[in-house]
């Protein structure tokens, strides 16, 4: 069991960074903390942005008061990749790699607790300042980044997604590697990897060509990152990513657009990173000895950049707070005017008992006076049902907006805004993963005390989702209070989700019913086919009995088919010889044609009269063929049955397999 380590940290002086503070610096979560529900261990502050496979939130560790970053990953995501990320982070203990503290399974979400880097990513800093970095700043950041790559590569780990968005800075100016969602492990039996993984613009040529790659693939990405920090975007950043994938292996290595602005040492450093032949490319250890890195200045030169970034965030926070207060003031003034307009009518109607809710028809309630016209109705789980005004529940939706705006204006309800850790790129350049690798899993604590009927989702996440909706860059907004107008929308969204879930369940149930109905219909069809076969057999037996009783009928039928006029010439002799008078005379040509036409539809229409006019050989041949024809029909029906049944069975097996994989991963953890 490990306890939080006490460390004194002196931050750089800035408008919103304390000059000196002493607090517990987390090193690893204790066993007691891992056994508790995560919401009892942490206080979630607000959302920072999006990382690979999940959203990242800023939180406070209650026991040590340390600020941490928590990635919440739904179990519906690729659990194998998530566990691989945890495994790699868990094995790393370096000041140049984001530290891993522990993880929880809370019902249907995985909570990954990591080190918090308050300055945010390099791409965030460039975006907020709206300018690129200087050469000295780039050298200092690349020095720490190379230290982190040396640490990983010595342990045969490939990051595979090096870019400015995955290089985080803390308030002390340390650069740390983050987001190991696509990292890989090289083993003794795996000299190189062949999977296409990474972000297209930063991807090495050998990764795109799938010819096998190793740790130096990160060096190519580092060179592209250096160009990104110097010019604001990677090479080919203005074209479509899929087109860039084809251009990177074919074109010469990229370089600076304006080389005159940069020193020869910096240009040479980038050229050694961007060597297309992996065997000729420099390693992280070799690049640490490069003149450009050896001449890098102390990280204290990053202080003005970090202070400027923090000042911009502080200004954005103040602007949002002022805008919220102004909007709340206007809403409050409007609400006062509306109450004043309705007060005269209310006073005339209810003068005796102000402030009392009196029953009205149909179970509704109406207030006696506008003096006490505001009452917040709290529903279960903190859902805001709005404001009860003079019109009672009928005016609920109209009065909810002013009250919610007034509530949202409270400074206590307006948390600090920070774009902090793992905020998505402005251009939304995601990480592309093609194919998959298999790596070992890691350790996490399962905190699923009891399985709920519906998926558990903390209420604060709904606020964050609404707050960040439509913001592709991950900028922060104040948390919506429980009295906000968005609360009603939240309740409506929850109802829609429940309805959708019920529809999905009904769809699955109907699918099972369809399968049962299909099997029942097939059984009925098989029974009908058997009945047809049995009927044909009975007809054949009856025909044989007739032929045995009248042996000359076969010869006469043959003669009838060969000579149509024979029946008329021999009608009297046949009667004299005892042939049954019921023997048919020669049918008219139209009648013959009709029966000839109906022969092909006999089994469909249920007409078997035409069999009387067939010869014994024809009947015998038809009897021999009917078994084969029935077998073909049964085979075709069986194929149709399997074609409709197999997709349902495959879907059910896939769900069982996926559930089994999740259970196996939980057991490993």
From Swiss-Prot:
<keyword id="KW-0418">Kinase</keyword>
<dbReference type="GO" id="GO:0001654">
    <property type="term" value="P:eye development"/>
</dbReference>
<feature type="domain" description="Protein kinase">
    <location>
        <begin position="42"/>
        <end position="293"/>
    </location>
</feature>
<keyword id="KW-0723">Serine/threonine-protein kinase</keyword>
<keyword id="KW-0808">Transferase</keyword>
<dbReference type="GO" id="GO:0001745">
    <property type="term" value="P:compound eye morphogenesis"/>
</dbReference>
<dbReference type="GO" id="GO:0090090">
    <property type="term" value="P:negative regulation of canonical Wnt signaling pathway"/>
</dbReference>
<dbReference type="Pfam" id="PF00069">
    <property type="entry name" value="Pkinase"/>
</dbReference>
<dbReference type="GO" id="GO:0007298">
    <property type="term" value="P:border follicle cell migration"/>
</dbReference>
<dbReference type="InterPro" id="IPR011009">
    <property type="entry name" value="Kinase-like_dom_sf"/>
</dbReference>
<feature type="domain" description="SARAH">
    <location>
        <begin position="608"/>
        <end position="655"/>
    </location>
</feature>
<feature type="modified residue" description="Phosphoserine">
    <location>
        <position position="33"/>
    </location>
</feature>
<dbReference type="GO" id="GO:0002011">
    <property type="term" value="P:morphogenesis of an epithelial sheet"/>
</dbReference>
<dbReference type="GO" id="GO:0035265">
    <property type="term" value="P:organ growth"/>
</dbReference>
<dbReference type="InterPro" id="IPR024205">
    <property type="entry name" value="Mst1_2_SARAH_domain"/>
</dbReference>
<dbReference type="GO" id="GO:0072089">
    <property type="term" value="P:stem cell proliferation"/>
</dbReference>
<dbReference type="GO" id="GO:0042771">
    <property type="term" value="P:intrinsic apoptotic signaling pathway in response to DNA damage by p53 class mediator"/>
</dbReference>
<dbReference type="GO" id="GO:0046666">
    <property type="term" value="P:retinal cell programmed cell death"/>
</dbReference>
<keyword id="KW-1003">Cell membrane</keyword>
<dbReference type="GO" id="GO:0070613">
    <property type="term" value="P:regulation of protein processing"/>
</dbReference>
<keyword id="KW-0472">Membrane</keyword>
<dbReference type="GO" id="GO:1901526">
    <property type="term" value="P:positive regulation of mitophagy"/>
</dbReference>
<dbReference type="GO" id="GO:0005524">
    <property type="term" value="F:ATP binding"/>
</dbReference>
<dbReference type="GO" id="GO:0035556">
    <property type="term" value="P:intracellular signal transduction"/>
</dbReference>
<protein>
    <recommendedName>
        <fullName>Serine/threonine-protein kinase hippo</fullName>
        <ecNumber>2.7.11.1</ecNumber>
    </recommendedName>
</protein>
<dbReference type="GO" id="GO:0016020">
    <property type="term" value="C:membrane"/>
</dbReference>
<feature type="compositionally biased region" description="Basic and acidic residues">
    <location>
        <begin position="460"/>
        <end position="479"/>
    </location>
</feature>
<feature type="binding site">
    <location>
        <begin position="48"/>
        <end position="56"/>
    </location>
    <ligand>
        <name>ATP</name>
    </ligand>
</feature>
<keyword id="KW-0547">Nucleotide-binding</keyword>
<feature type="region of interest" description="Disordered">
    <location>
        <begin position="432"/>
        <end position="508"/>
    </location>
</feature>
<dbReference type="GO" id="GO:0042127">
    <property type="term" value="P:regulation of cell population proliferation"/>
</dbReference>
<feature type="compositionally biased region" description="Polar residues">
    <location>
        <begin position="432"/>
        <end position="445"/>
    </location>
</feature>
<dbReference type="InterPro" id="IPR036674">
    <property type="entry name" value="p53_tetramer_sf"/>
</dbReference>
<dbReference type="GO" id="GO:0016324">
    <property type="term" value="C:apical plasma membrane"/>
</dbReference>
<dbReference type="GO" id="GO:0004674">
    <property type="term" value="F:protein serine/threonine kinase activity"/>
</dbReference>
<feature type="binding site">
    <location>
        <position position="71"/>
    </location>
    <ligand>
        <name>ATP</name>
    </ligand>
</feature>
<dbReference type="GO" id="GO:0008285">
    <property type="term" value="P:negative regulation of cell population proliferation"/>
</dbReference>
<dbReference type="GO" id="GO:0106310">
    <property type="term" value="F:protein serine kinase activity"/>
</dbReference>
<dbReference type="GO" id="GO:0010212">
    <property type="term" value="P:response to ionizing radiation"/>
</dbReference>
<dbReference type="GO" id="GO:2001233">
    <property type="term" value="P:regulation of apoptotic signaling pathway"/>
</dbReference>
<dbReference type="GO" id="GO:0051262">
    <property type="term" value="P:protein tetramerization"/>
</dbReference>
<keyword id="KW-0067">ATP-binding</keyword>
């Amino acid at each position: 069991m490990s306890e939080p380590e006490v460390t004194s940290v002196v931050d750089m002086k800035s408008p919103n960074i304390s000059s000196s503070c002493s607090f517990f610096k987390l090193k690893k979560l204790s066993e007691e903390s891992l056994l508790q529900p995560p919401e009892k261990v942490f206080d979630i502050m607000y959302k920072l942005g999006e990382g690979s496979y999940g959203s990242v939130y800023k939180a406070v560790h209650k026991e040590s008061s340390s600020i941490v970053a928590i990635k919440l990953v739904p179990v519906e995501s690729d659990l194998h990749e998530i566990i691989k990320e945890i495994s790699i982070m868990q094995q790393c203990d370096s000041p140049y790699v984001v530290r891993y503290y522990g993880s929880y399974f809370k019902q249907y979400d995985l909570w990954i607790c990591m080190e918090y880097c308050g300055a945010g990513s390099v791409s965030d800093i460039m975006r907020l300042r709206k300018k690129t970095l200087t050469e000295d700043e780039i050298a200092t950041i690349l020095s720490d980044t190379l230290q982190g790559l040396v640490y990983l590569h010595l342990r045969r780990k490939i990051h595979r997604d090096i870019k400015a968005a995955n290089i985080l800075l803390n308030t002390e100016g340390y650069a740390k590697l983050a987001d190991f969602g696509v990292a890989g492990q090289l083993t003794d039996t795996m000299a190189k990897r062949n999977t296409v993984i990474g972000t297209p613009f930063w991807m090495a040529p050998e990764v795109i060509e799938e010819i096998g790659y190793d740790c130096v693939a990160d060096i190519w990405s580092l060179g592209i990152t250096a160009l990104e920090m110097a010019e604001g975007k990677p090479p080919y950043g203005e074209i479509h990513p899929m087109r860039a994938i084809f251009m990177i292996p074919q074109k010469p290595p990229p370089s600076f657009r304006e080389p005159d602005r940069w020193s020869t040492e910096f240009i040479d450093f980038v050229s050694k990173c961007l060597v297309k032949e992996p065997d000729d490319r420099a390693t992280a250890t070799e690049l640490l000895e490069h003149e450009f890195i050896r001449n890098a200045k102390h990280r204290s030169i990053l202080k003005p950049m970090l202070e400027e970034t923090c000042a911009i965030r502080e200004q954005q926070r103040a602007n949002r707070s002022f805008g919220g207060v102004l909007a709340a003031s206007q809403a409050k003034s409007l609400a006062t005017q509306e109450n004043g307009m309705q007060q005269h009518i209310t006073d005339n109607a209810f003068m005796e008992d102000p402030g009392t809710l009196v029953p009205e028809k149909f179970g509704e309630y109406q207030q006696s006076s506008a003096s006490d016209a505001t009452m917040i109705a709290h529903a279960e789980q903190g859902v805001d049902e709005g404001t009860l005004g003079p019109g009672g529940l009928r005016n609920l939706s109209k009065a909810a907006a002013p009250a919610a705006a007034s509530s949202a204006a409270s400074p206590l309800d307006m948390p600090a805004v920070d774009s902090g850790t793992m905020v998505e790129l402005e251009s939304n350049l995601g990480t592309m993963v093609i194919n998959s690798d298999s790596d070992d899993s890691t350790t996490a604590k399962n905190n699923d005390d009891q399985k709920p009927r519906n998926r558990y989702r903390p209420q604060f996440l709904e606020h964050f989702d609404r707050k960040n909706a439509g913001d592709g860059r991950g900028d922060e907004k104040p948390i919506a209070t429980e009295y906000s107008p968005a609360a009603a929308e939240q309740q409506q969204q929850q109802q829609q989700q429940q309805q959708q879930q019920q529809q999905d369940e009904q769809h699955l149930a109907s699918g099972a019913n369809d399968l049962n109905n299909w099997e029942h219909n097939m059984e009925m069809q098989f029974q009908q086919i058997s009945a047809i076969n049995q009927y044909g057999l009975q007809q054949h037996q009856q025909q044989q009995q007739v032929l045995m009783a009248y042996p000359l009928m076969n010869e006469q039928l043959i003669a009838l088919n060969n000579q149509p006029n024979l029946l008329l010439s021999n009608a009297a002799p046949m009667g004299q010889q005892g042939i049954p008078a019921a023997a048919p005379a020669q049918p008219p040509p139209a009648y013959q044609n009709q029966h000839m036409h109906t022969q092909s539809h006999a089994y469909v229409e249920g007409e078997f009269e035409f069999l009387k006019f067939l010869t014994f050989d024809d009947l015998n041949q038809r009897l021999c063929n009917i078994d084969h024809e029935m077998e073909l029909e049964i085979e075709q029906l069986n194929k149709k049955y399997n074609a409709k049944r197999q997709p349902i069975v495959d879907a059910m097996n896939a769900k069982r397999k996926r559930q089994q994989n999740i259970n196996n991963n939980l057991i490993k953890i």
